[in-house]
Structures are given as structure tokens and as C-alpha cells.
């Protein structure tokens, strides 16, 4: 794997990510650049993953990065149901988008036909009147969300299995 370059790193603070998929755990980190864009630890071809949180901590120490100890968790082994945890669905959608952008691959959720459902999930998170954590959404939106997550494997395969980064 090529050396990870932290181009335009806004500061030395990075954030930890835990992805659970196919009963395996993968840790990585992300950071923001000066323009507010977020990047996973990558070398433009692969995203650097670690088997344990301690390995992530060690990597950050070796690279003089301040690791925020809060861990963003994404469990892709949990099947979506309706009523849906709209916050979890939106967060998973966003991390899949970030992975795809970092690896320059297609993520189905970025297609125009999904803009309306993404905006709906986003509005549930920031509704004026707070919604319950599990919220029954219209079936037309739920079917589109399921379609996006049924096609997540290509993005996760590229992240976790297409290289020797673990």
C-alpha cells in the first residue's frame, strides 16, 4: 500500500470509524480538509483499515495525528426494517458515499432517482418536531432505501476485500 498523504489536513485531529460487515470489524479514520470535505485514510487506491482500535491508535501516533476517541459505528449486518432508524440509515448512506468518493467508484445512492429519499431521511433527522428514533416512513421511500442498501456490497467489497490493507 502506498503511503497515506494527508493533503490539506485542516488540523491534526482525526476521527475514528468502526464498520461491521459480515461479522467482521474494521477500523479506519477520517479527517476534514480546509474546505470541509471529509476523507477516509486512503492513498487514492485503497482505504487503510485496521483490525483493532489499538492499531488505529498506534497508526495515528506514528503520524502525529490527534485521534478523537469517539467512534462512529456503522453496522451493515443489521437489516433495515420499517419503522426505520432514520438517523442510522442516513449515517450509513453518508459513509457509503464517502467510501465511494474516496475510492472513485459508483455508489447507487448518488443517482438522481434517490435524491428525494435522501432528502426525506435528512429532513427526518432535522425535523422541527423531534421524531421518535424508530419512525414509520412511506413504503415508496422505504423500498428505495432498501434498494440502495441491497447494492452496498460493491462499495464495501472495494473497501474491505479488494486490497491487502488488513
Language model segments and positions:
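Acidic-enriched, low-complexity/disordered segments with a strong bias for Aspartate over Glutamate
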Residues: 33-38, 43, 54, 70, ...
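A eukaryote-biased signal for long
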Residues: 90-166
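Context-gated lysine
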Residues: 2, 10, 20-22, 48-51, ...
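Generic structural signal of hydrophobic/aromatic residues within well-ordered alpha-helices
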Residues: 1, 5, 56, 60, ...
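ADP-ribosyltransferase catalytic core
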Residues: 59-98
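Short N-terminal edge-element motif at the start of the domain
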Residues: 1-67
Amino acid at each position: 500500500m502506498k503511503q497515506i498523504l494527508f493533503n490539506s489536513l485542516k488540523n491534526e485531529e482525526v476521527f475514528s470509524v468502526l464498520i461491521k460487515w459480515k461479522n467482521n470489524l474494521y477500523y479506519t479514520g477520517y479527517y476534514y480538509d480546509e474546505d470541509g470535505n471529509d476523507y477516509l485514510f486512503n492513498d487514492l487506491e485503497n482505504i487503510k483499515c485496521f483490525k483493532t482500535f489499538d492499531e488505529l491508535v498506534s497508526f495515528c501516533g506514528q503520524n502525529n495525528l490527534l485521534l478523537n476517541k469517539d467512534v462512529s459505528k456503522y453496522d451493515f449486518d443489521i437489516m433495515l426494517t420499517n419503522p426505520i432508524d432514520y438517523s442510522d440509515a442516513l449515517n450509513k448512506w453518508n459513509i457509503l458515499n464517502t467510501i465511494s468518493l474516496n475510492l472513485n467508484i459508483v455508489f447507487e445512492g448518488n443517482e438522481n432517482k434517490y435524491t428525494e429519499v435522501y432528502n426525506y431521511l435528512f429532513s427526518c433527522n432535522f425535523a422541527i418536531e423531534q421524531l421518535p428514533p424508530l419512525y414509520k416512513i412511506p413504503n415508496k421511500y422505504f423500498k428505495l432505501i432498501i434498494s440502495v442498501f441491497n447494492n452496498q456490497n460493491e462499495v464495501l467489497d472495494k473497501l474491505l476485500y479488494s486490497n491487502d490493507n488488513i
